Amino acid sequence: MTEILTTSNSAEDLLDMDGRVSEQRLAQLRIRQQQERVTKELRDVIQIHQCKKGIFCLVKQAKISYEITATDHRLSYELGPQRQKFTCMVGINPIVITQQSGDTKGCIHCSCDSIECTYTLLKTLCGLRDLLPMN
């Protein structure tokens, strides 16, 4: 006799299976689904972001993550090393200036009640170089 085992991910089946462990699994599943939804929304907002800086905007250059905690929202960003090269003429001699900066990491916190502040946080990141000039 062959038994057919079926698996179901409905909330009722998870709770009936083994009580407290099922509740923990269900809570983890909800958290994971919420984080996946937030990640997808973040990707969408980054895709549609446009400003006059174009590809030089921090929103387009940075590796961005978004976290929702019980007390606040946090947009974390990370920029890799950046290199600038500038050439100018002094008389007839060219002068080349090369400048390199290391990794830049940071985060922007928001303690509002709305979970829909992703766009505002991205606009803040977009204007960050105007607020805090970096080399």
Curated annotation (Swiss-Prot):
The keyword ATP-binding does not apply. It comes from the Viruses. Pfam families: Adeno_E3_15_3. InterPro entries: Adeno_E3-15 (IPR004985). Keywords: Early protein, Host-virus interaction, Inhibition of host caspases by virus, Modulation of host cell apoptosis by virus. One of its GO terms (biological process) is symbiont-mediated perturbation of host defense response. Protects virus-infected cells from TNF-induced cytolysis. Belongs to the adenoviridae E3_15 family. This is Early E3 15.3 kDa protein. It comes from Human adenovirus B serotype 7.
